[in-house]
A protein has these predicted regions:
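Cysteine-dependent hydrolase recognition
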Residues: 27-373
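Bacterial N-terminal signal peptides
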Residues: 11-21
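Bacterial N-terminal signal peptides that target proteins for export
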Residues: 2-13
Length: 373
């Protein structure tokens, strides 16, 4: 007599088989030096110094100023050709969505979807980020920030050993922030100070601003409600971000577990991520060096699972060398424990602003006088 399988068992087995197929290569490495910059002709001249620096760092850089003007389908074709003929590791889109279009899905754009270049899974086959600007001057500001950061052109490197954990109290925020704080403090070889800012605190905006401008921080792990123009639970607006003055105190990496803060497609000015990236001036850039933000609504449980992976695991894995790979690894690790739908939303909606090839600063360099890494 054949024994009938329990329907629940079959359902669970099916879920794990689907997850295995879709996320089977989630531990793949992002080794390689091929970089493709996609932009328009109006930004080409401003990119010269930046490209020369990337080449000096050992990257094989190609500049494409034609594909963007022809639309997302042509961009996808270019990326596929590049990947198929010699590989591709870093994709940097330079310009706002009106300059360099994104893959448009149901109700939101998805730059990460450009990286699905091999197989039928949901594992990106290259790293991607966007330097979102509207003018050559805005681009020069952000590129000067990248150059200053990568070359280590700082008089003081204390900011490397400082971190911020900022969290709402709901959606498991108290427990999440506590675990991050405990984990980071358990690495005194990396951190002297871990600043925890909670939704229940007073003067939250000032605390965030002071941590960036006065203390100087390596990264901000943020978990809370968000909007297109602000962190909502721990209030910090695009106006607050645009007015930051932290040229001398390092540029933080921001991992934003929040809805809509990376909505670069809105029509009423900059989203919060863009404001953080555009802060300062050409002579004195400020704000963040990178910002991971949602293009639309996000799944808080999935986001904080990825954030734990980033700042409790991969940050301390020194084989993970770049900001892009750090966030990529964290997202994929979280996806392995999600259903297909939740994993796909997390992957397609989370956008990295900045340069995905920028190396991480983990330790204060032995020589602190304008080092070139």
């Amino acid at each position: 007599m054949k024994q009938k399988k329990c329907p629940f068992f079959l359902l669970v087995l099916g879920y794990f088989l689907i997850a295995f197929v879709i996320f089977a290569n989630a531990d793949q490495s992002m080794a390689g030096n091929k970089m493709l910059i996609i932009t328009t002709s109006k930004y080409a001249k401003v990119l010269n110094k930046y490209i020369n620096w990337k080449i000096k760092r050992g990257l094989d850089v190609e500049l494409d100023i034609l594909s963007a003007e022809k639309g997302a389908e042509i961009i996808q074709r270019k990326l596929q050709e590049k990947y198929d003929h010699g590989g591709l590791t870093y994709i940097v889109l330079v310009g706002d969505i009106d300059d360099v279009p994104s893959v448009m899905l149901a109700g939101y754009p998805s730059d990460p979807s450009y990286t699905l270049l091999e197989g039928n899974d949901l594992i990106g086959d290259a790293l991607i980020s966007r330097i979102s600007v509207n003018t050559p001057a805005e681009l020069e500001n952000q590129l000067n920030k990248v150059l200053k950061y990568e070359k280590g052109d700082f008089e003081n490197f204390d900011w490397i050993r400082h971190a911020v954990v900022a969290s709402m109290t709901g959606f498991d925020g108290v427990d999440h922030a506590g675990k991050l704080e405990t984990s980071l403090k358990s690495h005194p070889d990396y951190f002297d100070e871990v600043i925890k800012i909670m939704e229940s605190d007073s003067n939250i905006t000032k605390k965030i601003r002071d941590s960036i401008e006065k203390t100087g921080v390596n990264f901000i792990a943020h978990h809370g409600h968000g909007s297109t123009t602000a962190f909502a639970s721990l209030h910090f607006s695009r106006e607050n971000a645009a007015n930051l003055k932290n040229f001398d105190t390092g540029f933080p990496i921001i991992h934003g577990a929040a809805c809509s803060t990376g909505s670069f497609w809105i029509e009423d000015g900059d989203c919060l991520a863009e404001a953080f990236m555009k802060a300062g001036t050409v002579e004195k850039p400020a704000g963040a060096i990178a910002f991971l933000g949602g293009a639309t609504s996000m799944d808080p449980g999935a986001c904080i699972a990825a954030q734990k992976e980033v700042f409790m695991n991969y940050y301390f894995d020194e084989d993970v060398e770049t900001i892009g790979e750090l966030f990529y690894k964290g997202t994929l690790a979280a996806m392995k424990n999600l259903s297909e739908d939740r994993g796909e939303r997390l992957f397609r909606r989370w956008h990295l602003f900045g340069d995905c090839s920028t190396p991480l600063w983990r330790k204060i360099p032995a020589k602190t006088s304008k080092n070139e890494r």
